């Protein structure tokens, strides 16, 4: 059996969820969209179900997967619905739904539903992706109430630059939100992972922890609360070949690495088809047999090479951690010029094994 595996620590997941609650004193929707950022949405939701206030997913397909697994907690559709015909399913399965565009509001007004809906009305406060314009927000709120199709409305927005701790844009977005919602007596939701960790002055009734649930920091710099996160995923494999090379020999496709000295090279059963970033350069950290070393050469589809010169005890079968508790996913992502969100979501072929259930 190929040794590439992703170990999912569900106790760490619970710790990170509790941290979001502790830091905010708010109710928290655990964001499990995109298969829980590659960690397995159903497993993660089941692990959190007894304590989570609810879950958030991107679309109805992801929500129905949770319902089919027996998850009865509230589930919010972050992108809302894509066509009016979905409203019947939303009502049938008791899902919560974001409304971010006036066409969705009109669809609710015009479409019969079996029971009133819980709507999260999203305002565009400056990200300019989706959301009702601030000048239209009060009217949209009143139209939802007047439709007779809605039992509850939560007011929400999304931050564009909360991961930049010195960015004035976040405070500006809060100011836009507060001005536009003035006089509306409804619960609010503003804080995503970086806002939960790094913006304690922002208050909201609901928070939406995403990347922090999985133990990865959303920041490019060290941050005290992010340091309390516990990595949930350990991507691991084993050495499948070892060879000794003299100085001046190439390693891998394109000969992008030339051994500067006699070099002991280990080949790991892990590649970009598994989701490991192909763009990770020589020098990206790896742990072999408990010792930190580095990637060398270009990542292949199914294999990559590591420098074992300073790990003489490593041999065929030695364990390898690509990221996890000893090598942070954020460090690998930074080396590869990307973000931990992406490298987690890219894992498609690697089996997931859970601990801490």
Swiss-Prot record:
The active site is at residues 33, 253. Its cofactor is pyridoxal 5'-phosphate. Keywords: Isomerase, Pyridoxal phosphate. The keyword Repeat does not apply. Its EC number is 5.1.1.1. One of its GO terms (biological process) is D-alanine biosynthetic process. Pfam families: Ala_racemase_C (PF00842), Ala_racemase_N (PF01168). Pathway: Amino-acid biosynthesis; D-alanine biosynthesis; D-alanine from L-alanine: step 1/1. The modification N6-(pyridoxal phosphate)lysine is found at residue 33. It catalyses: L-alanine = D-alanine. InterPro entries: Ala_racemase, Ala_racemase/Decarboxylase_C, Ala_racemase_C, Ala_racemase_N, Ala_racemase_pyridoxalP-BS, PLP-binding_barrel. Catalyzes the interconversion of L-alanine and D-alanine. May also act on other amino acids. Belongs to the alanine racemase family. PANTHER family: ALANINE RACEMASE, ALANINE RACEMASE, CATABOLIC-RELATED. This is Alanine racemase. It comes from Pseudomonas entomophila (strain L48).
């Amino acid at each position: 059996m190929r040794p590439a595996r992703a170990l999912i620590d569900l106790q760490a997941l619970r710790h990170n969820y509790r941290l979001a609650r502790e830091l905010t004193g708010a109710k928290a929707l655990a964001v499990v969209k995109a298969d829980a950022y590659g960690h397995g949405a159903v497993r993660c939701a089941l692990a959190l179900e007894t304590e989570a206030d609810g879950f958030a997913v991107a679309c109805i397909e992801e929500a129905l997967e949770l319902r089919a697994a027996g998850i009865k907690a509230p589930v919010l559709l972050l992108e809302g619905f894509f066509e009016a015909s979905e409203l019947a399913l939303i009502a049938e399965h008791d899902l919560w739904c974001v409304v971010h565009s006036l066409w969705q509001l009109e669809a609710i007004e015009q479409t019969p539903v079996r029971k009133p809906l819980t709507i999260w009305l999203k305002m565009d406060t400056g990200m300019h992706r989706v959301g009702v314009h601030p000048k239209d927000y009060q009217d949209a709120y009143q139209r939802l109430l007047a439709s007779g199709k809605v039992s509850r409305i939560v007011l929400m927005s999304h931050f564009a630059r909360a991961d930049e701790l010195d960015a004035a844009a976040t405070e500006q977005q809060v100011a836009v939100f507060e001005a536009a919602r003035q006089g509306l007596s409804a619960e609010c939701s503003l804080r995503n992972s970086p806002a939960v960790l790094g913006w304690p002055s922002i208050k909201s009734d609901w928070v939406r922890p995403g990347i922090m649930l999985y133990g990865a920091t959303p920041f490019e710099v060290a941050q005290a609360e992010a340091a309390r996160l516990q990595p949930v995923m350990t991507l691991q494999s084993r050495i499948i070949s070892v060879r000794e090379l003299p100085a001046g020999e190439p390693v891998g496709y394109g000969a992008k690495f030339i051994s500067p000295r006699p070099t002991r090279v280990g080949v790991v059963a892990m590649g970009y088809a598994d989701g490991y970033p192909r763009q990770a350069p020589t020098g990206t950290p790896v742990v072999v047999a408990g010792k930190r070393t580095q990637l060398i050469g270009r990542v292949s589809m199914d294999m990559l090479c590591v420098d074992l010169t300073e790990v003489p005890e490593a041999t065929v079968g030695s364990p390898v951690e690509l990221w996890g508790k000893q090598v942070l996913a954020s460090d690998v992502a930074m080396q590869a010029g990307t973000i931990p969100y992406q490298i987690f979501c890219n894992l498609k072929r690697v089996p997931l094994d859970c601990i801490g259930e």
